[in-house]
Protein backbone atom coordinates (compact mmCIF):
# COMPACT_ATOMS: atom_id res chain seq x y z
CA UNK A 1 0.00 0.00 0.00
CA UNK A 2 1.28 3.46 -0.93
CA UNK A 3 0.11 6.97 -0.07
CA UNK A 4 0.96 9.55 -2.72
CA UNK A 5 0.60 13.33 -2.73
CA UNK A 6 1.69 16.38 -4.69
CA UNK A 7 1.20 20.15 -4.62
CA UNK A 8 -1.98 19.66 -6.64
CA UNK A 9 -4.07 16.74 -7.86
CA UNK A 10 -6.39 16.65 -10.87
CA UNK A 11 -9.76 15.64 -9.42
CA UNK A 12 -12.96 15.82 -11.50
CA UNK A 13 -11.41 18.30 -13.91
CA UNK A 14 -10.12 20.67 -11.22
CA UNK A 15 -6.78 21.11 -9.47
CA UNK A 16 -7.12 20.53 -5.73
CA UNK A 17 -4.67 20.91 -2.86
CA UNK A 18 -4.28 18.61 0.13
CA UNK A 19 -5.09 15.39 -1.71
CA UNK A 20 -3.59 12.07 -0.66
CA UNK A 21 -4.19 9.09 -2.94
CA UNK A 22 -3.85 5.56 -1.58
CA UNK A 23 -3.06 2.75 -4.02
CA UNK A 24 -2.68 -0.98 -3.46
CA UNK A 25 0.14 -3.21 -4.64
CA UNK A 26 -1.55 -3.57 -8.05
CA UNK A 27 -1.73 0.19 -8.59
CA UNK A 28 -5.48 0.39 -7.99
CA UNK A 29 -6.74 3.47 -6.15
CA UNK A 30 -8.32 2.40 -2.87
CA UNK A 31 -8.93 5.74 -1.16
CA UNK A 32 -8.69 9.51 -1.69
CA UNK A 33 -8.44 11.73 1.39
CA UNK A 34 -8.39 15.51 1.78
CA UNK A 35 -6.26 17.36 4.32
CA UNK A 36 -5.66 20.98 5.32
CA UNK A 37 -1.95 20.27 5.16
CA UNK A 38 0.04 17.22 4.15
CA UNK A 39 3.43 18.37 5.41
CA UNK A 40 3.39 16.26 8.56
CA UNK A 41 1.48 13.20 7.40
CA UNK A 42 3.30 9.94 8.02
CA UNK A 43 4.24 7.51 5.24
CA UNK A 44 3.21 9.83 2.41
CA UNK A 45 5.30 9.96 -0.76
CA UNK A 46 5.39 13.58 -1.91
CA UNK A 47 6.18 14.57 -5.50
CA UNK A 48 6.47 18.25 -6.51
CA UNK A 49 4.03 19.35 -9.21
CA UNK A 50 0.63 17.97 -10.17
CA UNK A 51 -0.64 14.45 -9.55
CA UNK A 52 -2.60 13.35 -12.62
CA UNK A 53 -4.00 10.06 -13.92
CA UNK A 54 -1.90 8.10 -16.36
CA UNK A 55 -2.06 9.81 -19.73
CA UNK A 56 -3.89 8.26 -22.69
CA UNK A 57 -2.21 8.69 -26.05
CA UNK A 58 -5.27 8.69 -28.28
CA UNK A 59 -3.42 8.47 -31.60
CA UNK A 60 -0.06 6.87 -32.29
CA UNK A 61 1.78 4.99 -35.03
CA UNK A 62 4.33 3.14 -32.92
CA UNK A 63 5.39 1.01 -35.89
CA UNK A 64 6.79 4.12 -37.63
CA UNK A 65 9.24 4.91 -34.81
CA UNK A 66 12.13 3.73 -37.00
CA UNK A 67 11.53 6.82 -39.19
CA UNK A 68 12.60 9.23 -36.45
CA UNK A 69 14.30 12.08 -38.32
CA UNK A 70 14.05 10.35 -41.71
CA UNK A 71 11.54 12.74 -43.29
CA UNK A 72 12.19 16.46 -43.57
CA UNK A 73 9.86 19.02 -42.06
CA UNK A 74 7.47 21.11 -44.16
CA UNK A 75 7.01 18.58 -46.95
CA UNK A 76 3.31 19.33 -47.02
CA UNK A 77 0.54 16.80 -46.73
CA UNK A 78 0.84 14.97 -50.05
CA UNK A 79 4.63 15.25 -49.97
CA UNK A 80 4.78 13.57 -46.58
CA UNK A 81 2.66 10.66 -47.83
CA UNK A 82 4.99 10.20 -50.80
CA UNK A 83 8.09 10.36 -48.57
CA UNK A 84 6.73 7.63 -46.30
CA UNK A 85 6.44 5.35 -49.30
CA UNK A 86 9.94 6.26 -50.50
CA UNK A 87 11.90 5.61 -47.29
CA UNK A 88 10.04 2.91 -45.41
CA UNK A 89 11.76 0.07 -47.27
CA UNK A 90 15.23 1.16 -46.16
CA UNK A 91 15.13 -0.45 -42.70
CA UNK A 92 15.42 -3.99 -41.37
CA UNK A 93 12.82 -5.66 -39.17
CA UNK A 94 15.30 -5.60 -36.31
CA UNK A 95 15.68 -1.83 -36.64
CA UNK A 96 11.91 -1.39 -36.66
CA UNK A 97 11.38 -3.54 -33.58
CA UNK A 98 14.17 -1.83 -31.65
CA UNK A 99 12.86 1.65 -32.49
CA UNK A 100 9.35 0.68 -31.37
CA UNK A 101 10.71 -0.67 -28.09
CA UNK A 102 12.61 2.56 -27.43
CA UNK A 103 9.54 4.69 -28.16
CA UNK A 104 7.36 2.48 -25.96
CA UNK A 105 9.79 3.00 -23.09
CA UNK A 106 9.80 6.77 -23.66
CA UNK A 107 6.01 6.91 -23.42
CA UNK A 108 5.88 4.80 -20.27
CA UNK A 109 8.48 6.91 -18.49
CA UNK A 110 6.57 10.07 -19.41
CA UNK A 111 3.42 8.72 -17.77
CA UNK A 112 1.40 7.16 -20.61
CA UNK A 113 -0.65 4.15 -19.53
CA UNK A 114 -2.79 3.45 -22.60
CA UNK A 115 -2.41 4.06 -26.33
CA UNK A 116 -4.66 3.91 -29.38
CA UNK A 117 -2.10 2.58 -31.84
CA UNK A 118 -2.57 2.39 -35.60
CA UNK A 119 -0.89 -0.56 -37.32
CA UNK A 120 -0.41 -2.04 -40.76
CA UNK A 121 1.13 -5.36 -39.74
CA UNK A 122 1.93 -7.44 -36.66
CA UNK A 123 5.72 -7.03 -36.61
CA UNK A 124 5.89 -5.01 -33.38
CA UNK A 125 2.96 -6.67 -31.60
CA UNK A 126 5.38 -8.55 -29.27
CA UNK A 127 6.73 -5.16 -28.13
CA UNK A 128 3.22 -4.05 -27.24
CA UNK A 129 2.31 -7.34 -25.56
CA UNK A 130 5.37 -7.09 -23.29
CA UNK A 131 4.81 -3.42 -22.53
CA UNK A 132 3.54 -1.95 -19.27
CA UNK A 133 1.30 0.22 -21.44
CA UNK A 134 -2.16 -1.01 -22.46
CA UNK A 135 -2.31 -0.84 -26.25
CA UNK A 136 -5.51 -0.77 -28.27
CA UNK A 137 -4.36 -1.65 -31.79
CA UNK A 138 -6.39 -0.73 -34.85
CA UNK A 139 -5.20 -2.31 -38.09
CA UNK A 140 -5.82 0.25 -40.80
CA UNK A 141 -6.95 -0.42 -44.34
CA UNK A 142 -5.18 1.94 -46.70
CA UNK A 143 -4.90 2.43 -50.44
CA UNK A 144 -7.26 3.13 -53.31
CA UNK A 145 -6.47 -0.30 -54.77
CA UNK A 146 -7.50 -2.10 -51.56
CA UNK A 147 -10.71 -4.04 -52.20
CA UNK A 148 -11.25 -6.02 -48.99
CA UNK A 149 -10.38 -5.73 -45.30
CA UNK A 150 -9.89 -9.47 -44.74
CA UNK A 151 -6.24 -9.01 -43.75
CA UNK A 152 -7.07 -6.34 -41.17
CA UNK A 153 -9.85 -8.41 -39.62
CA UNK A 154 -7.60 -11.49 -39.50
CA UNK A 155 -4.82 -9.60 -37.73
CA UNK A 156 -7.23 -8.03 -35.24
CA UNK A 157 -8.72 -11.43 -34.38
CA UNK A 158 -5.37 -12.58 -33.00
CA UNK A 159 -5.11 -9.96 -30.27
CA UNK A 160 -6.90 -8.46 -27.30
CA UNK A 161 -8.00 -4.83 -27.62
CA UNK A 162 -7.72 -4.91 -31.41
CA UNK A 163 -9.89 -4.04 -34.39
CA UNK A 164 -9.86 -2.73 -37.96
CA UNK A 165 -10.26 0.85 -39.11
CA UNK A 166 -10.30 2.83 -42.35
CA UNK A 167 -7.20 5.00 -42.66
CA UNK A 168 -9.04 8.10 -43.81
CA UNK A 169 -11.81 9.54 -45.95
CA UNK A 170 -9.45 10.07 -48.90
CA UNK A 171 -7.46 6.83 -49.15
CA UNK A 172 -10.03 4.03 -49.33
CA UNK A 173 -12.78 3.16 -51.76
CA UNK A 174 -16.42 3.09 -50.74
CA UNK A 175 -17.04 -0.64 -50.38
CA UNK A 176 -14.15 -1.48 -48.08
CA UNK A 177 -14.70 1.70 -46.03
CA UNK A 178 -18.30 0.67 -45.40
CA UNK A 179 -17.30 -2.94 -44.74
CA UNK A 180 -15.05 -1.87 -41.88
CA UNK A 181 -17.43 0.77 -40.54
CA UNK A 182 -20.17 -1.85 -40.19
CA UNK A 183 -18.03 -4.57 -38.59
CA UNK A 184 -16.67 -5.01 -35.08
CA UNK A 185 -17.11 -3.05 -31.88
CA UNK A 186 -13.73 -1.39 -31.30
CA UNK A 187 -13.67 2.36 -32.06
CA UNK A 188 -12.88 3.49 -35.57
CA UNK A 189 -9.94 5.90 -35.81
CA UNK A 190 -10.10 7.94 -39.01
CA UNK A 191 -7.60 10.56 -40.19
CA UNK A 192 -9.87 13.50 -40.85
CA UNK A 193 -9.35 16.90 -42.48
CA UNK A 194 -5.64 17.10 -41.79
CA UNK A 195 -5.29 19.49 -44.74
CA UNK A 196 -7.30 21.46 -47.28
CA UNK A 197 -6.35 18.85 -49.88
CA UNK A 198 -8.89 16.43 -48.43
CA UNK A 199 -11.83 18.76 -49.05
CA UNK A 200 -10.37 19.81 -52.41
CA UNK A 201 -10.27 16.17 -53.53
CA UNK A 202 -14.05 15.95 -53.25
CA UNK A 203 -14.20 18.94 -55.63
CA UNK A 204 -11.65 17.42 -58.02
CA UNK A 205 -8.68 19.70 -57.51
CA UNK A 206 -5.66 20.07 -55.22
CA UNK A 207 -2.51 18.03 -54.66
CA UNK A 208 -4.29 14.77 -53.78
CA UNK A 209 -6.48 15.00 -56.88
CA UNK A 210 -3.43 15.77 -59.03
CA UNK A 211 -1.45 12.87 -57.53
CA UNK A 212 -4.27 10.38 -57.97
CA UNK A 213 -4.86 11.57 -61.53
CA UNK A 214 -1.19 11.12 -62.46
CA UNK A 215 -1.29 7.58 -61.05
CA UNK A 216 -4.51 6.76 -62.88
CA UNK A 217 -6.38 6.12 -59.63
CA UNK A 218 -10.11 6.79 -59.52
CA UNK A 219 -12.17 7.54 -56.40
CA UNK A 220 -15.68 6.12 -56.10
CA UNK A 221 -16.59 8.21 -53.05
CA UNK A 222 -16.46 11.80 -54.28
CA UNK A 223 -20.24 11.92 -54.65
CA UNK A 224 -20.52 12.36 -50.88
CA UNK A 225 -19.35 15.94 -51.36
CA UNK A 226 -17.07 16.24 -48.33
CA UNK A 227 -15.17 14.12 -45.81
CA UNK A 228 -17.73 14.85 -43.08
CA UNK A 229 -20.64 13.90 -45.35
CA UNK A 230 -18.89 10.66 -46.21
CA UNK A 231 -18.55 9.70 -42.56
CA UNK A 232 -22.14 10.66 -41.76
CA UNK A 233 -23.35 8.56 -44.69
CA UNK A 234 -21.10 5.54 -44.11
CA UNK A 235 -20.50 5.04 -40.39
CA UNK A 236 -23.36 3.74 -38.21
CA UNK A 237 -24.61 6.29 -35.69
CA UNK A 238 -23.88 3.97 -32.77
CA UNK A 239 -20.24 3.21 -33.75
CA UNK A 240 -17.63 4.76 -31.42
CA UNK A 241 -15.53 6.99 -33.65
CA UNK A 242 -12.26 8.87 -33.24
CA UNK A 243 -11.45 11.63 -35.74
CA UNK A 244 -7.76 12.48 -35.91
CA UNK A 245 -6.22 15.91 -36.65
CA UNK A 246 -9.22 17.96 -37.80
CA UNK A 247 -6.96 20.89 -38.72
CA UNK A 248 -9.30 22.03 -41.48
CA UNK A 249 -12.59 21.01 -39.89
CA UNK A 250 -15.31 23.65 -39.83
CA UNK A 251 -18.11 24.29 -37.38
CA UNK A 252 -20.46 22.90 -40.03
CA UNK A 253 -18.49 19.64 -40.12
CA UNK A 254 -18.57 19.30 -36.35
CA UNK A 255 -22.30 20.06 -36.16
CA UNK A 256 -23.08 17.53 -38.90
CA UNK A 257 -21.20 14.75 -37.12
CA UNK A 258 -22.56 15.66 -33.69
CA UNK A 259 -26.05 15.34 -35.14
CA UNK A 260 -25.26 12.02 -36.83
CA UNK A 261 -23.68 10.08 -33.98
CA UNK A 262 -25.52 8.95 -30.86
CA UNK A 263 -22.33 9.71 -28.94
CA UNK A 264 -20.42 12.52 -30.63
CA UNK A 265 -17.00 11.55 -31.99
CA UNK A 266 -13.80 12.33 -30.14
CA UNK A 267 -11.50 14.72 -31.99
CA UNK A 268 -7.86 13.81 -31.37
CA UNK A 269 -5.36 16.61 -31.87
CA UNK A 270 -1.68 16.03 -32.67
CA UNK A 271 -0.29 19.58 -32.89
CA UNK A 272 3.40 18.68 -33.09
CA UNK A 273 2.78 16.48 -36.11
CA UNK A 274 0.69 19.14 -37.83
CA UNK A 275 3.42 21.74 -37.39
CA UNK A 276 6.07 19.31 -38.58
CA UNK A 277 4.30 18.39 -41.81
CA UNK A 278 2.45 21.55 -42.83
CA UNK A 279 3.02 24.27 -40.24
CA UNK A 280 -0.68 24.39 -39.37
CA UNK A 281 -2.53 24.11 -36.07
CA UNK A 282 -5.83 22.44 -35.15
CA UNK A 283 -8.87 24.71 -34.58
CA UNK A 284 -9.12 24.07 -30.86
CA UNK A 285 -11.15 27.21 -30.08
CA UNK A 286 -13.81 26.27 -32.64
CA UNK A 287 -13.94 22.68 -31.40
CA UNK A 288 -14.42 23.90 -27.84
CA UNK A 289 -17.14 26.35 -28.89
CA UNK A 290 -18.95 23.50 -30.65
CA UNK A 291 -18.80 21.35 -27.51
CA UNK A 292 -16.56 18.75 -29.12
CA UNK A 293 -14.84 16.12 -26.99
CA UNK A 294 -11.10 16.67 -27.48
CA UNK A 295 -8.25 14.26 -26.77
CA UNK A 296 -4.52 14.34 -27.54
CA UNK A 297 -2.23 12.07 -29.53
CA UNK A 298 1.43 12.01 -30.47
CA UNK A 299 1.08 10.69 -34.01
CA UNK A 300 4.37 9.12 -35.13
CA UNK A 301 8.09 9.78 -35.00
CA UNK A 302 7.96 10.02 -38.79
CA UNK A 303 6.05 13.28 -38.40
CA UNK A 304 7.35 14.66 -35.10
CA UNK A 305 10.61 15.05 -33.22
CA UNK A 306 9.11 13.57 -30.06
CA UNK A 307 6.65 10.87 -29.06
CA UNK A 308 5.58 13.04 -26.15
CA UNK A 309 2.16 13.84 -24.74
CA UNK A 310 3.68 16.65 -22.67
CA UNK A 311 5.16 18.30 -25.77
CA UNK A 312 1.78 18.18 -27.50
CA UNK A 313 0.06 19.65 -24.44
CA UNK A 314 2.53 22.54 -24.51
CA UNK A 315 1.67 23.28 -28.14
CA UNK A 316 -2.07 23.72 -27.52
CA UNK A 317 -3.03 27.39 -27.53
CA UNK A 318 -5.75 29.29 -25.69
CA UNK A 319 -6.77 26.63 -23.18
CA UNK A 320 -6.38 26.24 -19.46
CA UNK A 321 -4.00 23.75 -17.90
CA UNK A 322 -6.89 21.78 -16.41
CA UNK A 323 -8.55 21.47 -19.82
CA UNK A 324 -5.30 20.32 -21.42
CA UNK A 325 -4.73 17.72 -18.72
CA UNK A 326 -8.30 16.47 -19.08
CA UNK A 327 -7.81 16.08 -22.84
CA UNK A 328 -4.64 14.06 -22.17
CA UNK A 329 -6.26 11.77 -19.61
CA UNK A 330 -10.02 11.36 -19.21
CA UNK A 331 -11.00 12.29 -22.76
CA UNK A 332 -8.47 9.88 -24.20
CA UNK A 333 -9.94 7.16 -22.01
CA UNK A 334 -13.40 8.07 -23.30
CA UNK A 335 -12.13 7.74 -26.87
CA UNK A 336 -11.00 4.18 -26.15
CA UNK A 337 -14.07 3.26 -24.11
CA UNK A 338 -12.02 2.66 -20.94
CA UNK A 339 -13.06 5.66 -18.84
CA UNK A 340 -14.54 3.31 -16.25
CA UNK A 341 -11.03 2.22 -15.25
CA UNK A 342 -8.53 4.74 -16.62
CA UNK A 343 -8.18 8.47 -17.14
CA UNK A 344 -9.26 9.81 -13.74
CA UNK A 345 -8.26 9.79 -10.09
CA UNK A 346 -11.16 8.15 -8.31
CA UNK A 347 -11.90 5.05 -6.27
Segments from the language model and where they lie:
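Histidine/acidic-residue-rich, glycine-tolerant segments that coordinate divalent metal ions
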Residues: 112-233, 246, 250-252, 276-279
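Glycine-enriched alpha-helix->loop->beta-strand junction motifs that scaffold or abut catalytic
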Residues: 132-135, 183-187, 236-241, 256-268, ...
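Active-site gating loops and adjacent loop-to-helix segments of metal-dependent hydrolytic enzymes
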Residues: 66-98, 136-139, 195-239, 260-261, ...
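His/Asp/Glu-enriched, well-ordered alpha-helical/loop segment
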Residues: 233-237, 280-347
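N-terminal metal-binding scaffold of metallo-dependent hydrolase/deaminase domains
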Residues: 1-39
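Active-site metal-binding motif and surrounding structural segment of the metallo-beta-lactamase
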Residues: 35-52, 183
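Histidine-centered catalytic micro-motifs
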Residues: 53-65, 187-196
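Alpha-helical scaffold segments that flank or form the walls of functional sites
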Residues: 22, 50-51, 66-131, 152-159
Amino acid sequence: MRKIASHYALINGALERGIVVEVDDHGTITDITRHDTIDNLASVEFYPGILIPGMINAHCHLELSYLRGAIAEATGFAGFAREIGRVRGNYTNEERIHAASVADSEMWHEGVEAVCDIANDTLIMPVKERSKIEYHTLFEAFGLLTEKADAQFAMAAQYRHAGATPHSTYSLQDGVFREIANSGSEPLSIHMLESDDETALYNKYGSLWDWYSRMGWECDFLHYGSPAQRIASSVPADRPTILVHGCKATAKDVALLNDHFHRPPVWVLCPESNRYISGITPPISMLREMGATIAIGTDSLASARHISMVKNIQLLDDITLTNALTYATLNGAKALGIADRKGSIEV
